[in-house]
């Protein structure tokens, strides 16, 4: 069922609703673990990543889990909630557990913590969770840039960057985690220049 859903999402979201072009897809090694970190400007952003990677878990805002039916469907496809308004230790621990499920487990986190609509907010909003999880788990971050706020039937570029190693020793250093988080978000938006 999971593979069928991946194919369906690719056809509907990546070929019909939008025309998605992947750049740097060869940088994804599906035999490896990654903390996948894209920018976020569109509710459908996860559907551009879902078809191209294996064993993906997705961290999503807790608000979308209020509907029981929606929550049941999301959990079936390894989507789990995070409370964005406060430090959510439970979700952070669950994220690390997800990376330990299989040898090639992957975790999708939007490091901006939500959809960024205003272009003035680009590069200014970044949360530290992705870098902390990467440092704690020893799993590299894979930065990805997705075309911002595309119109329906428009071409969408999904640009994959080189993976980033986060030193394990910084996990207890708040300033270092913040520093690496800022570098990461800049790295993500710098990928836009490649297209």
Q: At which residue positions do the language-model features occur?
A:
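Short, flexible active-site-adjacent loop segments at beta-strand->alpha-helix junctions, enriched
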Residues: 26, 40-41, 62, 85-86, ...
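Short, glycine/polar-rich helix-capping loops at beta-to-alpha or helix-loop-helix junctions
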Residues: 5, 65-70, 151-153
């Amino acid at each position: 069922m999971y593979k069928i859903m991946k194919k369906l999402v690719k056809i509907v979201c990546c070929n019909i609703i939008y025309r998605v072009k992947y750049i740097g897809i060869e940088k994804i090694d599906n035999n490896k673990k990654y903390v996948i970190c894209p920018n976020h400007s569109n509710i459908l952003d996860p559907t551009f990543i879902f078809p191209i990677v294996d064993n993906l878990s997705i961290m999503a805002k807790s608000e979308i889990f209020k509907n029981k039916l929606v929550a049941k469907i999301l959990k079936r496809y390894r989507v789990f909630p995070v409370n964005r308004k406060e430090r959510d230790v439970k979700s952070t621990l669950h994220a690390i557990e997800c990376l330990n499920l299989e040898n090639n487990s992957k975790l999708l986190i939007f490091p901006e913590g939500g959809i960024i609509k205003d272009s003035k907010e680009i590069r200014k909003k970044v949360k530290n969770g992705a870098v902390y999880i990467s440092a704690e788990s020893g799993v590299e971050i894979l930065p990805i840039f997705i075309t911002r706020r595309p119109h329906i039937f428009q071409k969408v570029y999904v640009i994959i960057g080189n993976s980033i190693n986060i030193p394990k020793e910084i996990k207890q250093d708040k300033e270092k985690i913040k520093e690496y988080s800022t570098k990461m978000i800049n790295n993500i938006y710098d990928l836009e220049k490649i297209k």
